[in-house]
């Protein structure tokens, strides 16, 4: 869960805890004490399993995002104190008119779902730290200058002296904090980079394009992972004026333009069909995430060849001999 802190009148931390999966928390402080609650946009667990995921504001010196509640007196009896991270959206104005406190926690919510998928198959996993940078000033650009919000696009970035995820937040242009598939897609790239291996060239790509096989695999993998983590094969990405437009596609769709190993749609449809348990008339394999995770973090990561669909699927067929014909 996220970190919840009790602060005294001087801003010092007098108690700290973490929320459970439902957002519940418990803190013990002295009676009749002035207290302010602060919720930090971070999920941290030391030991095994372990992880450290933090949302920061790249336009504010990478300050950790947090929600600060109102001050209250702890009294002499147990209290229930609920905090709400507001979206900042005013329906009547069709605009954000106040602080967008919910954004960082919406991002962490998708990270949480993605993490659960990993823990289901790797319950003792120790996952490398990840910093997720989000700001309402983050906008599409042609250059990368995160200090002022120029992040090109929502992306998992390795280079420019950074290694982490950057998320768009520009109102009426492109906001991605609530686009769970987009966040999970980039988390898939994090998994490739930190738990496995990627030889992707990066750069521009579309779901219909003929691509370098390394790029096609990386993007197709992350599309498929997003559907697995979110639990929905319909990929959705909102954008535009009042965030009213959307780009969508179904990763389970096997009718693909430019079908082949050089096409990310081909890759994501194959991987998702291996994973899912829904027989759609094309696939009958329901292997779940385990074999795919094992492959991504072992033989695919160690291949002497460049990473592509060919460095994962053949070994999956070896591990799933009863499904070889279905995979083909």
PLM feature spans:
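Short, ordered, surface-exposed loop/turn motifs in non-cytosolic proteins
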Residues: 1-10, 32, 286
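Short, acidic Ser/Thr/Gly-rich low-complexity loop/linker segments typical of extracellular
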Residues: 7-24
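Short Pro-Gly-centered beta-turn/loop motif in secreted/extracellular proteins
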Residues: 26-36
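Zn2+-dependent metallopeptidase catalytic core
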Residues: 28-30, 49, 85-134
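Structured interaction patches on ligand/partner-binding surfaces of diverse proteins
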Residues: 44-86
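Catalytic zinc-binding patch centered on the HExxH motif and its immediate surroundings
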Residues: 133-164, 177-178
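Short pre-active-site segment immediately N-terminal to the catalytic Zn-binding motif
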Residues: 167-183
